[in-house]
Amino acid sequence: AASDVYKRQEFDYFKYAGNDARFNVPIDKTHQYYNPVLTGFYPDPSLCRVGDTYYLVNSSFTFFPGVPLSTSKDLVNWTPAGHVLDRTSQVPLKGQQVSAGIFAPAISYNKKNKTFYMITTNVGAGNFFVKSKDPSKGWSEPIYLKKIDGIDPSFFFDDNGKGYIVHNGPVVGGADYEGQRAIRCFEFDVKGDSIKGDFKEILRGGTHVEARPIWIEGPHLFKKGKFYYLMCAEGGTGGWHSEVILRAKNPMGPWEECPNNPILTQRTGLDPNRKDPVSSAGHADIVEDGKGNWWAVFLACRPYEEDMYNTGRDTYLLPVTWKNGWPEILAKNTPISTVGEKAGLKPAGKNEFSGNFSYVDNFDAADNGIGLKDLNQRWMFLRDFTDCYKVENGKLNMQLLPGNIYKREPMSAIWARQQHGTFSAETEINFTPRNDKEIAGLALLQKEDHNFVLGKTMKNGKLMITLTRAEKNNVTIASAPIKGGKLKLKVEGHDRYYDFYYAEEGGDWQLLAKGVDASNLSTQKSGGFIGACIGLYASSNKE
């Protein structure tokens, strides 16, 4: 009878479909691809190549497991490969707000000791790295680097085996203006897994310092020919975002600015009314394919109006061209196109990362991948993992924890990304609330105080379906009486406006609320850094 707490709420399936107009352009998948290559909340991409395989990581903030890892043979067709931080001991997240946690991971491979390194910042615990000889077999416990004051650390391993860490930090002597930051460089003792000596401030403020640049961050060091290159994001991860580059004969500088900076941006020189706009491009990483071709991955967004997007920051791919010893990711005043060209692509099976796609998760063995116990990798937990569910006989059974979506505490919910502006998500629940506080159903999350809950509950002892919208304050905007039995729930998104439906057992879909303003799920409204997530959610709401 002990497992009966898991029987309180049952989800039968989860169905998702994305249908954005911009991806309804037919392509030849042997030499064309859709941007973004990782759709939805996959920000701050970093990658490395080992042999013929590319390894890519993204930020995960307070979701667990942390730092999704994807692999590819061609940079376009990506396969989920687990998470770097899959044990709570590696990534303490307790009590952190949604957009804290893990910022901007960077992945590197040291050829000398044949070891992968992933270094990142946990806002609540400090800067650290983990390492692995074989990512498919897991990663080490965290090694914290207390000397790093700042965010966005990244490793560089030179041909001679020497190690370096670059990161964003405060300006030595204090900032002269808001947003002024610096890039620092440390030498790294590879054998001792520790930082050597003190840092050097290698870039102060950014490029074109006379223009008072802001938020220089996301630095990566790499080498080509006789030059070392320092590539950074600049302008902040919004509409003014960009990528800039400098070069030097030594990883500690002195640095020469590229005369063509920024080498990637969507901030100026573009028609604001252009079709299928892409915004906020920056935070890039760069890789060579082993045949002399260079490619960049970076984050950008698909706004539905001005600076609003619910899908978060996606991962894009573009070729890099070299001229006079400098790389360029995108020519000035060029809009990022939805379709990219790359020869020799090998699409295999179904791509649930790029373009329009749909999936049904039946919570059966076929769905269970490498991720949370007995669940497909698409599912994430928020903050420290709580053993609140069991997958049995093709059902997801969930107990009702007292925590809820509005608080920074453990709750019964698993989350998948909203990957399209035009989408639908549905589930069927089998749940009987015992009082007016208990609720279970579908949730849409951007932040603790920016979300929706579409759920089955009770009001004055009568069964109800309710829709609650949070934008700072929680407001129940629609409700309807329902009978007992199973209940289907569905949300259909149309960029800014969402429609919410329900269907009683054996009955047709009923519209509960139409054209609801869902801009509360945008970072523009909420502040923060994640893309909206769709949750299977249950709470007892006990005080």
Where are the model-predicted features located?
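Short, small-residue-biased leader/transition segments that mark boundaries at the very start
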Residues: A1-Y6
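Short beta-strand segments and strand-loop junctions that repeat across beta-rich extracellular domains
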Residues: R49, L69-D74, F129-D134, L246-N250, ...
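Repetitive beta-architecture junctions, highlighting loop-to-beta-strand starts
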Residues: P65-V67, A125-N127, R181-I183, H241-E243, ...
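Repeat-solenoid scaffold signature
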Residues: T268-L318, K323
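Short loop/turn segments immediately following beta-strands, especially the blade-tip
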Residues: S70-L75, K131-K137, F186-I195, I245-E256, ...
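Extracellular glycan-recognition regions
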Residues: K7-P26, S60, W326-P327, A331-E543
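Surface loop/turn signatures of beta-propeller and other carbohydrate-active proteins
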Residues: K7-C48, V76-S108, T120, G138-F157, ...
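Hydrophobic core segments of beta-strands in well-ordered, beta-rich domains
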Residues: V37, P43, C48-F63, I102-V123, ...
